[in-house]
Amino acid sequence: MVKKVALLTAGGFAPCLSSAIAELIKRYTEVSPETTLIGYRYGYEGLLKGDSLEFSPAVRAHYDRLFSFGGSPIGNSRVKLTNVKDLVARGLVASGDDPLKVAADQLIADGVDVLHTIGGDDTNTTAADLAAYLAQHDYPLTVVGLPKTIDNDIVPIRQSLGAWTAADEGARFAANVIAEHNAAPRELIIHEIMGRNCGYLAAETSRRYVAWLDAQQWLPEAGLDRRGWDIHALYVPEATIDLDAEAERLRTVMDEVGSVNIFISEGAGVPDIVAQMQATGQEVPTDAFGHVQLDKINPGAWFAKQFAERIGAGKTMVQKSGYFSRSAKSNAQDLELIAATATMAVDAALAGTPGVVGQDEEAGDKLSVIDFKRIAGHKPFDITLDWYTQLLARIGQPAPIAAA
């Protein structure tokens, strides 16, 4: 019998965390009301520190209130249990301690039978490390993860929770920001969208923004011209960017339309930026997982610098939709997937089946409990998809060429 279940949200926010917690509470209350539910605060940091809260009967009775909010009610952090040096530096473990053992011992001390991790590839691969450690040391714990990331880059999962909503919100953000295209003559607007190594979110945001444009009624005779609101360039990490050719093409757009709007993944062009920083002796900032801290190197500003003078921009503006998009409440499309995923996660946990619940691309996208050993990150966006190549053709951008 499962007596106690712990929930944990980790990594960056996505528009699914609060809703996923709500669905897990709902399902456990339906099928195992006697099971105690707790949440570790601030992800793996809370687990290491033994910082948790219990979901009381009052919480379980009003779980539906969580659907109205984004973020995570129990908080997140970026902690990698196998990065001992970072954990010691942050005071989360003592020098000489094994963080996996500290986490495992805390779970046992708290009497936890099941741990649900809600996170992206880093969170779930960290959960896999913990699960492997527990198995080696005969700890009786079942770990069942739920896949969360707005990058939608978890292998082998078709659709991660929150990514659809993030794209919707990014398109909504763009609808307001792009209205600035004629706030000054010859304006260059760069919409920077989250996506470290994967262009999915930038592409899907662009697709949904263009769908919004298609649904509008225009009045060019009064200056309300779709051309000024359109996307003129879309750059993702998976495709090469010919800066010279693009500058020439966008100069023509600027001359004809009077403004230029560029949508980019924050990871687009990063190898060039990093190489440039290293060549000039600058330190490249990284996080606990070894990722380049993109918010500190500002890819959008870099692209603005590359293009502004060459296309004759009178004013340049860089706007980032990332935090706006990732902190939204779940939309209807995501809510349906979250409910199905949480239901299967609870059922798997009660049956003692570990893994990550997701649409398995290697099994016809069937929602399944996927073995932790098969979970990996950095799944690239497929730049050969028909809708994507058609989108680029529509905005006048050459067909994509895969980056090396």
Swiss-Prot record:
Q: Where is this site: Important for catalytic activity and substrate specificity?
A: D122
Q: What is its EC number?
A: 2.7.1.90
Q: Report residues binding diphosphate.
A: G12
How does its activity get regulated? Non-allosteric.
The answer on whether this UniProt entry bears the keyword Repeat reads no
Q: Reaction(s) catalyzed by this protein?
A: beta-D-fructose 6-phosphate + diphosphate = beta-D-fructose 1,6-bisphosphate + phosphate + H(+)
Q: In which pathway does it act?
A: Carbohydrate degradation; glycolysis; D-glyceraldehyde 3-phosphate and glycerone phosphate from D-glucose: step 3/4
Positions binding substrate in this chain are T149, I150, D151, M194, G195, R196, E266, Y323, F324, S325, R326
Active site positions:
D151
Fetch the SUPFAM superfamilies from UniProt: Phosphofructokinase
Query: Principal place where this protein is found?
Result: cytoplasm
Please give the function described in this protein's UniProt entry: Catalyzes the phosphorylation of D-fructose 6-phosphate, the first committing step of glycolysis. Uses inorganic phosphate (PPi) as phosphoryl donor instead of ATP like common ATP-dependent phosphofructokinases (ATP-PFKs), which renders the reaction reversible, and can thus function both in glycolysis and gluconeogenesis. Consistently, PPi-PFK can replace the enzymes of both the forward (ATP-PFK) and reverse (fructose-bisphosphatase (FBPase)) reactions.
Identification of the protein by name: Pyrophosphate--fructose 6-phosphate 1-phosphotransferase
What is the native source organism of this protein?
Propionibacterium freudenreichii subsp. shermanii (strain ATCC 9614 / DSM 4902 / CIP 103027 / NCIMB 8099 / CIRM-BIA1)
Record gene name: pfp
